[in-house]
């Protein structure tokens, strides 16, 4: 990235310039042109029964395959969330009928381009830049959403038109949305090309009946075919009109939860050419800037001679920021942001930094080794296919000394229940975590060889450890 040092983005001349010298954080909004030209500011989760076409819809809107990783199944449920960004445009010719005047493209598309619709004039202009968070499974989606590893502003609920509604998992997804208190939902009736019109109408009635009395009541139901890209422009229009622009905090000290990290150096690279590690995540609040000094907590975790946990935060500097292929000078909340640092690349290799929190030096929360939580358990297990009409298994109460998986932010760690009474519990964590009182956590238990979400909790207080810092 030549010339980026001076605080001005020079890459991609077709996108809006970002200049650190003239940046006034107090004037930024999630629709500021110089922000949405290069990065997404609204996060939309995609939810739906397996094989109902979530990734296909995301691909139809954004042109991006949210790639899946082979090792995903092997490692507990460390999830790779698939993120895909899309720009949504509106044609500035008032004579063009809706929904044809809406269009979506990938995130590196210019902010304006001439119309190609016969009989219209003018340009398509950028109105929104959204990020789709595509989760493989719903208990994972819930854990992710519950933890707040990504701020979710809205959800697309996918229902396949060629199956009856509701499928067993679909009702759980609604439960997930209820727990998450997501207000803004669009229901997409997918695979409409595979059914007769009468069947589609019948299913539409089923969907209406199904969402009655839930958070999704009154949500628009849009018939689409993701494969044939049919009605995708209607989805774009509804995203613009029905999903309000979320209030965002640009002025606090920045904080980013790391959900991916990697070493971008090729093997055999000359020492002088080595690049620092890259961390990827969604900014929760504040604005990160190129050149800024940062701290990563808990940092490097080790044990002292007595077996006590020690944490040594990592201090570094941001050398580059990017969203998908777009260079940034500063990054705001929303979408997945890559942060190029001067951290030793071996510390970032193969997702080693996942679960850490990155932010301004001295402004990050405490590091906890034990948590006291107030918790809620689900009445029944989610996501377990039951035979016939049998109800899903009941969730048993927490018992002392059992080991649960605790998801805090993007960190999945083991936790031993050391005490439990009524709706309060104490958990001793296997790995220290940087978090604060009031944060939500998700609890999972091993049921028939799988981790299953059994409930969620909120941190009341805990045991913290002081980070060790070198004297130099």
UniProtKB/Swiss-Prot annotation:
EC number(s) reported in the record: 3.6.5.3
Region (G5): 225-227
Enzyme class of the recorded protein, top EC level: hydrolase
Region ranges (G2): 76-80
Entry GO terms, CC: cytoplasm; cytosol; eukaryotic translation initiation factor 2 complex; synapse
Residues covered by the tr-type G domain: 39-248
PANTHER family reported for this sequence: EUKARYOTIC TRANSLATION INITIATION FACTOR 2 SUBUNIT 3 FAMILY MEMBER (PTHR42854), EUKARYOTIC TRANSLATION INITIATION FACTOR 2 SUBUNIT 3-RELATED (PTHR42854:SF3)
One Gene Ontology MF term: GTP binding
Name of encoding gene: Eif2s3
InterPro entries: EFTu-like_2, eIF2G, eIF2g_C, eIF2g_dom_2, eIF2g_GTP-bd, P-loop_NTPase, T_Tr_GTP-bd_dom, Transl_B-barrel_sf
Family matches, as Gene3D superfamilies: P-loop containing nucleotide triphosphate hydrolases (3.40.50.300), Translation factors (2.40.30.10)
Segments of this protein annotated with the region G1: 48-55
Residue numbers spanned by region G3: 134-137
Protein's recorded name: Eukaryotic translation initiation factor 2 subunit 3, X-linked
Statement: the UniProt record of this protein carries the keyword Ubl conjugation: no
Keyword annotations of the record: Acetylation, Cytoplasm, GTP-binding, Hydrolase, Initiation factor, Nucleotide-binding, Phosphoprotein, Protein biosynthesis
Function, as annotated: Member of the eIF2 complex that functions in the early steps of protein synthesis by forming a ternary complex with GTP and initiator tRNA. This complex binds to a 40S ribosomal subunit, followed by mRNA binding to form the 43S pre-initiation complex (43S PIC). Junction of the 60S ribosomal subunit to form the 80S initiation complex is preceded by hydrolysis of the GTP bound to eIF2 and release of an eIF2-GDP binary complex. In order for eIF2 to recycle and catalyze another round of initiation, the GDP bound to eIF2 must exchange with GTP by way of a reaction catalyzed by eIF-2B.
One GO process term, biological-process aspect: cytoplasmic translational initiation
